[in-house]
């Protein structure tokens, strides 16, 4: 998949945070990135990779609840499970395939074993858009130390398994091949590219380049994606599947999209093995902020995160990007002043995203601690319906700061702030 040059692509990132005057400055225009012509295709892996990492994997009823929420969110593809792993998985894959809408790709994972591939096909064949997903290692380390076979046998296994899967799906479905541990194949990148080409030659419709274990910086992985993409046919549909072992999965996935990846494999709440998979919400909003048209229903993100947290029995970290309870709070006086002065603008001084966009019930939240200034006092009481001036807020701020310090530097409640405000009013 060779990339369009900037001169060939008229769609340039439209960053709403930058004025038109700034856009015209030479140094800024040089940093603009062409927006890919293809829309991102979100292939959700919550029901497979996310589910297999849970302490208590979901039952069919819970899987159906997640499945329907994914449809509400608007993902274009759903990997419903690993059909050959056990009978419960098979039945879940079969049932979810039977209720899938016409416009959503339904996938089941399988190892490169014909018997397992056949089970996957039996489970999903009645879906309107079925896809068999085959995974097999391509990194030298895994081939030598886990498979313990020759590279030639690896290529032969890929060829046979993909061809067999293609013979099953025919023109009705698709085949995806994942080169497991692609992110660890820098030392044998030519071999990995050959493996993907063989998969394509035998009927693969999508090739997936996973960062199965995140060990290195995003730039290195993205460079590997570019290198392989340039060796494959121009119309190759490249997929990315990144894990979050070092906390960089979102960055890696976003940059891989700009490097040519069409399909982005992500999970709700970032669920997945070890530190999880790429978080769907983070990738979606990051691309949106870069001017990319993202075909998801953003307004369902917040409710989706709460539902997934409840069903997975995994609490949402209060500082989790976008969905954490505390990520819209501001406590520093400098920050609060900037928030207060830009609340009415589309771009906030300290606001990375619009809370309403993702369905959060409230926007910027200003709290008072001993680090807060008069802007916090003014905004808190003004929002509560009190008639207060900035001058009065300035007089009240040191009183509240002293109380906060006396109480162990804790945050003050609205009621505590109001009590001191009323005392000040009586003294005026």
From Swiss-Prot:
Mn(2+) binds at residues 49, 241, 243, 277. One of its GO terms (molecular function) is 2-isopropylmalate synthase activity. It is an enzyme of class 2 (transferase). It catalyses: 3-methyl-2-oxobutanoate + acetyl-CoA + H2O = (2S)-2-isopropylmalate + CoA + H(+). One of its GO terms (biological process) is L-leucine biosynthetic process. Induction: Expression is significantly repressed by leucine and moderately repressed by isoleucine. Keywords: Amino-acid biosynthesis, Branched-chain amino acid biosynthesis, Cytoplasm, Leucine biosynthesis, Manganese, Metal-binding, Transferase. Its main location: cytoplasm. InterPro entries: 2-IPM_HCS-like, AIPM/Hcit_synth_CS, Aldolase_TIM, IPMS_Lepto, LeuA-like_post-cat, PYR_CT. It comes from the Bacteria. The keyword Transferase applies. It is found in: Cytoplasm. Its EC number is 2.3.3.13. Residues 40-302 form the Pyruvate carboxyltransferase domain. It holds the Pfam family HMGL-like. Its cofactor is Mn(2+). The keyword Cytoplasm applies. Catalyzes the condensation of the acetyl group of acetyl-CoA with 3-methyl-2-oxobutanoate (2-ketoisovalerate) to form 3-carboxy-3-hydroxy-4-methylpentanoate (2-isopropylmalate). Has high alpha-isopropylmalate synthase activity and low citramalate synthase activity. Is missing the C-terminal regulatory domain compared to orthologs. NCBIfam families: IPMS_Lepto. This is 2-isopropylmalate synthase 2. It comes from Leptospira interrogans serogroup Icterohaemorrhagiae serovar Lai (strain 56601). The lineage of its organism: Bacteria, Pseudomonadati, Spirochaetota, Spirochaetia, Leptospirales.
């Amino acid at each position: 998949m060779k990339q369009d040059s900037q001169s060939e692509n008229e769609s340039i990132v439209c960053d709403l945070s930058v004025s038109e005057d700034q856009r015209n400055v030479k140094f800024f225009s040089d940093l603009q990135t062409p927006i890919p012509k293809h829309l991102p295709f979100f292939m959700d892996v919550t029901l497979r990779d996310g589910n297999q990492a849970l302490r208590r994997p979901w039952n069919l009823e819970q899987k159906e609840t997640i499945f329907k929420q994914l449809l509400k969110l608007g993902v274009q593809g759903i990997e419903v499970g690993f059909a050959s792993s056990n009978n419960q998985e098979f039945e879940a894959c079969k049932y979810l395939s039977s209720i899938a809408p016409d416009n959503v790709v339904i996938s089941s994972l399988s190892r490169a074993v014909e018997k397992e591939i056949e089970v996957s096909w039996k489970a999903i064949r009645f879906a309107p858009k079925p896809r068999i997903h085959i995974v097999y290692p391509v990194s030298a380390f895994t081939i030598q130390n886990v498979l313990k076979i020759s590279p030639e046998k690896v290529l032969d296994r890929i060829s046979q398994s993909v061809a067999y899967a293609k013979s099953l799906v025919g023109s009705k479905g698709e085949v995806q091949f994942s080169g497991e541990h692609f992110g660890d194949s820098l030392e044998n990148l030519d071999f990995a590219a050959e493996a993907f080409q063989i998969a394509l030659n035998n009927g693969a419709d999508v090739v997936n380049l996973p960062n199965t274990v995140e060990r290195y910086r995003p730039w290195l992985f993205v460079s590997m994606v570019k290198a392989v993409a340039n060796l494959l046919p121009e119309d190759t549909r490249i997929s990315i599947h990144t894990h979050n072992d070092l906390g960089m999965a979102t960055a890696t996935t976003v940059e891989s999209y700009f490097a040519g990846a069409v399909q982005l494999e992500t999970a709700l709440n970032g669920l997945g093995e070890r530190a999880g998979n790429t978080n769907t919400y983070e990738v979606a909003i990051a691309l949106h902020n870069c001017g990319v048209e993202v075909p998801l229903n953003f307004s369902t993100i917040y409710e989706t995160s709460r539902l997934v947290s409840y069903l997975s029995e995994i609490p949402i970290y209060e500082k989790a990007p976008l969905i954490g309870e505390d990520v819209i709070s501001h406590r520093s006086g400098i920050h609060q002043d900037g928030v207060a002065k830009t609340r009415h603008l589309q771009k906030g001084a300290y606001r990375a995203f619009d809370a309403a966009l993702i369905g959060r019930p409230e926007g910027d939240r200003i709290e008072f601690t001993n680090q807060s200034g008069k802007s916090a006092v003014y905004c808190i009481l003004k929002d509560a319906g009190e008639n207060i001036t900035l001058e009065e807020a300035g007089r009240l701020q040191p009183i509240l700061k002293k109380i906060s310090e006396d109480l162990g530097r804790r945050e003050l409640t609205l009621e505590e702030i109001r009590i001191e405000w009323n005392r000040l009013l009586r003294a005026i």
